[in-house]
UniProtKB/Swiss-Prot annotation:
Its main location: cytoplasm. This is Phosphopantetheine adenylyltransferase. It comes from the Bacteria. InterPro entries: Cyt_trans-like, PPAT, Rossmann-like_a/b/a_fold. Reversibly transfers an adenylyl group from ATP to 4'-phosphopantetheine, yielding dephospho-CoA (dPCoA) and pyrophosphate. Its EC number is 2.7.7.3. The keyword Ribonucleoprotein does not apply. GO terms for molecular function: ATP binding; pantetheine-phosphate adenylyltransferase activity. The keyword DNA-binding does not apply.
Amino acid sequence: MKVAVFPGSFDPITWGHIDLIKRSLAIFDKVVVLVAKNKSKKYLLSDIERFTLTKDVISSLNFLNVFVDSYSGFIVDYALINSIKFIVRGIRAFNDFDIEFERYLVNNKLNFKIDTIFLPSSAEHLYVRSDFVKELMRKKDVDLSHFVPELVFNRLKSKFIDK
């Protein structure tokens, strides 16, 4: 069975993430969506909120063989512990590639047996970023349906609009 881990902060999960998960399923038998905990990053949502929201969205989409987990260490360590040989990373633009390629090089030094698969974003999701979602949520009456599922919008609404 070919298994991949798709790590991210998912603060929040977007249609871009979901597209990459769906496309990963065409390559791998099982995909673990890993909600990463990075102590140096500042998140809008708590670790539990990011995990729960990601899990709820994945459940609502009825994906088979997609599982949600969380981890606070190096992704290659998670992969090794769970016998996963592939890490999937999404690439939107050239600057993403530079960052992700550096991550790949570091991961490869830590464990050369775990490979990284780069998936370019679909054209309709090239501009979708969690940061943009958080920025746009500050505006009232904004349509975010191109960025996030309704479930995500409704959860974020309580953090922004309902205050």
